[in-house]
Amino acid sequence: MNILDQLAEYSRLRVAEDKKKISLEEMKNIAIQTKNEKLCDFAFEKALKKDGLSFICECKKASPSKGLIEPDFRYLEIAREYEAAGADCISVLTEPKWFLGSDEYLKEIAKTVSIPCIRKDFTVDEYQIYQAKTLGAAAVLLICSILSEEQLGEYIKICDSLGISAIVEIHDEKEAGMAVRADARIIGVNNRNLKDFTVDTANSKKLRDLIPDDIIFVSESGVKSTDDIRVIREIGADAVLIGETLMRADDKKAKLDELRLS
């Protein structure tokens, strides 16, 4: 079993435990009743539709490929730094075992910043989508590799019903077709292969032509330099998601400024 399969399986176990505390029907009702102007009218999508390249900046304490990234995880301070530096959205890891994430990180960050947040986790059950909205997320991640085409379409419709967005993550040509057929409005190409953790930023360039222009195109992972950003701009991406590069920067504002202005 590769790491992606392990992450998906652990998500199923987490959901089963969460359902013992709050049932699916209860979680649905809470999500439907959750009112927040940052969650209305697909704020995440709107933030990515502005002119030029949008930046999604990630808060994460660790990762399976890099281990512990930030022992002293000042997540609220980091989120504030990102917002002050001009980030358009914030990605918050909530997966607890391999990424050392927490639902509380998302809940507190979403309350603290004025820009939209995405719950970065391994969605394997509709429960997690409703849960994400109650935590303050304006978007969720849907990974084609761990979902059937039927699930993907269903989960996008649930997001639509809640007024939140979905980044549909793809890794290859087959998944690109799956995402387009499911009526995804935001498609992210992960330049990191989650099965073996190899990184190839050319993956975004390779898959770009398969995505219609009316779909928001996001390049994810492996972005380290101004040269990487230039390539991403050249292929016509609408947004880029940057994690480790910013997390390891002593001056996050300076690093984001450097990348944004390249």
Q: For each of these PLM feature ranges, what is it?
A:
Residues 2-70:
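An N-cap/entry alpha-helix motif that binds or orients negatively charged groups
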Residues 7, 57, 82, 132, ...:
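Conserved, mostly hydrophobic/aromatic
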Residues 10, 60-62, 95, 122, ...:
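Active-site beta-loop-alpha junctions enriched in small/polar residues
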Residues 59, 66-167, 173-179, 204-207:
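N-terminal active-site wall of soluble small-molecule enzyme domains
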Residues 124-135, 173-182, 219, 223-242:
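Catalytic cores of alpha/beta
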Residues 131-150, 188-197, 235-255:
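Glycine-rich phosphate-binding active-site loops on the catalytic face of alpha/beta enzymes
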Residues 206-210, 233, 248-262:
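C-terminal helical cap(s) of enzyme catalytic domains, especially alpha/beta-barrels
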